[in-house]
Design a protein with these regions (language model features):
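Short, solvent-exposed loop/turn segments at secondary-structure junctions
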Residues: 18-19, 30, 41-43, 146-150, ...
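Short His-Asn-centered micro-motif
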Residues: 14, 142-145, 229
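Conserved phosphate-donor/acceptor-positioning beta-strand/loop module used by diverse small-molecule
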Residues: 143-146, 154-180
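A glycine- and Lys/Arg-enriched "phosphate-lid" helix/loop adjacent to the NTP-binding pocket
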Residues: 165-166, 174-206
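Gly/lys/ser-thr-rich phosphate-binding loops in alpha/beta enzymes
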Residues: 1-55
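PAPS-dependent sulfotransferases, especially Golgi type II membrane carbohydrate sulfotransferases
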Residues: 1-17, 103-119, 179-189, 206-209, ...
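PAPS-dependent sulfation machinery
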Residues: 39-141, 185-191, 282
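PAPS/PAP-binding and catalytic site of the sulfotransferase fold
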Residues: 20-34, 154-159, 226-251, 277-280
């Protein structure tokens, strides 16, 4: 990016998986000037190495958007890109180690310029954002990578005007959702999104919440917004308007009605299978856990997550 260019606005969405972030990204991609990249952290693993499909159905190297982004981002020709992408992935994994996460979170304001892994990931993320903005003309990029330390990396980048949306969902609902597999179709091929056991889901929900609370100390309050999934589902248009206000982008709402929006093909590079959804969509609350989740499991989740549940306004049932 040229130093004379205006900064790119980036909204990092943090939170636990199965919290509606991909649907939210699809909605925001309908706003003029917005580009939802999905979980950008997976671009090099799932996009380059595994060639998983973009939201448009094409592999990233065949996608009209991501193929150009990769050409501008990676320094090697296609035959050697796997090695370059592998180095980025290895650095990402190093930053994700539990012993390194706090250090990454503290680097949100900059610094640690001698940490090779962090420097490599910063360079890759910054180049990808700049290239995506140039290719698509987006002035706002929505990144739903969800992990707080990925958002910290984004916050430290020069020429990025960084914002954070912390999406929370009742951990009982998250645990129940992860026990249900999701099947979707890409180019006529059926694919399944796997399940996760309750203890693993609880650990990740807790780690996500704690990481977000730590990240919040490093981000100006004027650039931070917390939103509950349940509140969003009750009044989605109002909450999307709140997000636009946070970003200083009071553009027209993409909603046709208070709870309905028409989604078009997008270029979300990684995320929940809902990124392949097109057409009219009604936003509805999924609270099946209330009737389908065993009381014992609800109690276990509550015991493990009670402090953050109370902080986020969730009532304990047991």
């Amino acid at each position: 990016m040229d130093e004379s260019d205006p900064p790119i606005k980036v909204l990092s969405v943090v939170g636990a998986g199965r919290s509606g972030t991909t649907v939210l990204a699809s909605i925001l991609s309908e706003v003029d000037g917005f580009g939802s990249v999905g979980e950008l952290r997976w671009l090099w693993q799932r996009g380059v190495l595994e060639r998983r499909p973009c939201g448009c159905g094409e592999a990233p190297d065949k996608c009209p958007v991501w193929s150009r982004v990769l050409d501008a981002t990676l320094t090697t020709a296609p035959p050697e890109r796997r090695e370059e992408a592998s180095k980025i992935v290895a650095s990402q994994r190093r930053l994700a180690k539990p012993r390194n996460r706090w250090r990454v979170l503290r680097s949100a304001r900059g610094g640690d310029d001698d940490w090779e892994a962090l420097v490599r990931v910063r360079s890759a993320m910054g180049a990808a954002c700049s290239a995506y903005s140039r290719v698509t003309g987006s002035r706002v990029i929505v990144d739903t990578s969800k992990r707080p330390f990925d958002a910290a990396v984004m916050a430290s980048l020069p020429h990025i005007e960084h914002y954070v949306l912390h999406v929370v969902r009742d951990p009982r609902a998250v645990a129940h959702s992860w026990r249900r597999s999701k099947t979707f179709s890409v180019a006529g091929e059926a694919r399944t999104m796997g399940t996760r056991r309750l203890p693993a889901t609880v650990r990740r929900w807790w780690a996500s919440g704690l990481g977000a609370e730590l990240l919040r100390r490093e981000v100006p309050s004027s650039r931070w917004l917390r939103m509950r999934y349940e509140d969003f589902c009750v009044s989605p248009r109002e909450h999307v308007d709140n997000i636009l206000s946070l970003l200083g982008e009071p553009g027209p709402s993409p909603f046709e009605a208070a709870d309905r929006v028409v989604l078009h093909h997008n270029h979300i590079v990684a995320g929940n299978p809902s990124r392949f959804t097109v057409g009219a969509v009604k936003i509805e609350l999924d609270d099946a856990w209330r009737s389908e989740m065993r009381t014992r499991d609800q109690h276990l989740v509550e015991l493990a997550t009670a402090p953050l549940m109370r902080r986020y306004g969730y009532r304990l049932r047991h």
